[in-house]
Amino acid sequence: MSPMARTAPVPAATDPAIIRNFCIIAHIDHGKSTLADRMLQYTGVVKQRDMKAQYLDRMDIERERGITIKSQAVRMPWELDGNSYALNMIDTPGHVDFTYEVSRSLAACEGAVLLVDAAQGIEAQTLANLYLAMENNLTIIPVLNKIDLPAAQPEKYAAELANLIGGDPEDVLKVSGKTGVGVEALLDKIVRDLPAPVGDPNAPARAMIFDSVYDTYRGVVTYVRVVDGMLHPRERIQMMSTRATHELLEIGVSSPEPTPSKGLGVGEVGYLITGVKDVRQSKVGDTVTNLAKPASESLSGYADAKPMVFSGLYPLDGTDYPVLRDALEKLMLNDAALVYEPETSAALGFGFRVGFLGLLHLEITRERLEREYNLDLISTAPNVEYEVTLEDKKVIHVTNPSEYPTGKISEVREPMVSATILAPNEFVGSIMELCQSRRGQMRGMDYLSEDRVELRYWIPLAEIVFDFFDLLKSKTRGYASLDWKADGEQVADLVKVDILLQGEQVDAFSAITHRDKAYAYGVMMTGKLRELIPRQQFEVPIQAAIGSRIIARESIRAIRKDVLAKCYGGDITRKRKLLEKQKEGKKRMKMVGRVEVPQEAFIAALTTDESKDKAKK
């Protein structure tokens, strides 16, 4: 068995020289959580009988989807050459939506284990996280995982990794998180190669928050990394960005179950409990200091998480509105990036406009609402935030098509992203075609090896939030991977397309789209509604319009009764009289008639295909 530390170093009395803080960065599905499981087992912090797969992923959704959403920090003892060391492993999310959380986790470390699947090679998020690690000046240990797979090509990818970060292919460690091969060698290498944390134990306390989780019984549990000074229980602490003060009720380390300690010293990673009930009180990236002896300046790199994608969430059953409100409030306790405000739609009733970090964040939030609170929800098509400047120089921020101003508009700005796409080189043509059709501008292209290409595009966020990723996967047989980050904005020719039913606007179907795509959207939506709305006694025109200009039209034909059925033969004038009378009646009906759009039509027209399948079940 492994050389576990016989006497684990005690928190608060640990010399920073024997501490090693590291995180594991990898693309989704490259075996990060499995490797973490093996480390927990080999260092002896989790007993063999308590071991379960993905030990650190606590949420059901995390386990089911096999993704990590919240960061976790674990303290593990390890012994090398007769000396005991304390290793702090910080598990990070791998998905692009949670990049800010990853960057804060990286800032809490001195080193990173760059994990790459030996059967799949380097992917877009591996690169994105690697660049983040390099920006934070971390020491990087390259590791190939899953070498037990029959499809593994360790030699090929070791050369690719060495080429990417500089170094020798021989230095790339080969491990298997599943069987445990090479994990001890990796732990030894972490102790040997990673630098110890540096800080001043006598300076005022400064600790960086890299995650905060809401616990039903204890309130908010804040995970911190101490940079300078010491933190002790029962002290009063202050958050430097909000200036809020709290009493430290409990302080300790996770290994991996929470273990209270007498304090935390320089370089140590642990948790704080202050009894606060709202996660927004302890923001990721903020600095914690001692109220009695506060630090003069906070640690750099703090930023507010900014929502990128907005969507309306409406309960199918209007009476569930209060339940949805409470559910969103509770989720906000655990997710500082979630923002919402109430909104009403003439068509869908009362609901909320919710802001998310990205599509995965939207999907997970919606799934948690449906699963944990038994809600049935309709979500409208995702939108981004546009900045509309009117001719009188007034600026309006629009996240919902119904807020789009009708007056004279001088310009509309839309958010842009830098997208990095990695794919085998045979798909370059179809990827370029897709990006150009989405108004992307090419920024560069590099060959990582003879058969893998990195494409860089500057592309509007609105074009990638809906179905871009699905199309990219289908065009590349699932081989491409995508990573993006917000990158400025541009002036664009955007218009609001309204859908009119018998001359009346239906707010739920309006969309903000590029002028070139407006016609296609109008034709698609009018066609869809023609199929979905039941026929009436009179003809119903469905029109798509930009302002007052109609760009597309479909008609739902009237149902008519055969008024001539009772005439057997007889004079033509008699028949004409009956037909004229029917025509008059239809005309009158059309003047006063209202078209009721059934709920099913709304759901079918608004949902993407994936949620449609859900609705069928």
From Swiss-Prot:
Among InterPro entries, the record links this protein to: EF-4 (IPR006297), EFG_III/V (IPR035647), EFG_V-like (IPR000640), EFTu-like_2 (IPR004161), G_TR_CS (IPR031157), LepA_C_sf (IPR038363), LepA_CTD (IPR013842), LepA_IV (IPR035654)
What SUPFAM superfamilies does UniProt report for this protein, alphabetically?
A: EF-G C-terminal domain-like (SSF54980), P-loop containing nucleoside triphosphate hydrolases (SSF52540), Translation proteins (SSF50447)
Question: What residue stretches are annotated with the tr-type G domain?
Answer: 17-198
Q: What is its EC number?
A: 3.6.5.n1
- Look at the named UniProt entry and state the broad enzyme category this protein falls under: hydrolase
List where the protein spans the membrane: none
Which positions does UniProt annotate for GTP binding? 29-34, 145-148
Q: Does the keyword Protein biosynthesis apply?
A: yes
| Any one annotated GO CC term | plasma membrane
Which branch of life, at top level? Answer: Bacteria
Where found? Cell membrane
The record's catalysed reaction(s) read: GTP + H2O = GDP + phosphate + H(+)
Instruction: Quote one Gene Ontology molecular function term.
Output: ribosome binding
Topology versus the membrane, per the UniProt entry? Peripheral membrane protein
Q: Please provide the Gene Ontology terms (biological process) for this protein.
A: positive regulation of translation
Entries under CDD domains matching the protein: EF4_II, EF4_III, LepA, lepA_C
Q: SMART domains recorded for this chain?
A: EFG_C
Please provide the record's keywords in A-Z order.
Cell membrane, GTP-binding, Hydrolase, Membrane, Nucleotide-binding, Protein biosynthesis
Question: Which family does the record assign?
Answer: Belongs to the TRAFAC class translation factor GTPase superfamily. Classic translation factor GTPase family. LepA subfamily.
What does the UniProt function comment say about this protein?
Required for accurate and efficient protein synthesis under certain stress conditions. May act as a fidelity factor of the translation reaction, by catalyzing a one-codon backward translocation of tRNAs on improperly translocated ribosomes. Back-translocation proceeds from a post-translocation (POST) complex to a pre-translocation (PRE) complex, thus giving elongation factor G a second chance to translocate the tRNAs correctly. Binds to ribosomes in a GTP-dependent manner.
NCBIfam families reported for this sequence: lepA, small_GTP
UniProt-recorded name of the protein:
Elongation factor 4
Species for this entry: Paenarthrobacter aurescens (strain TC1)
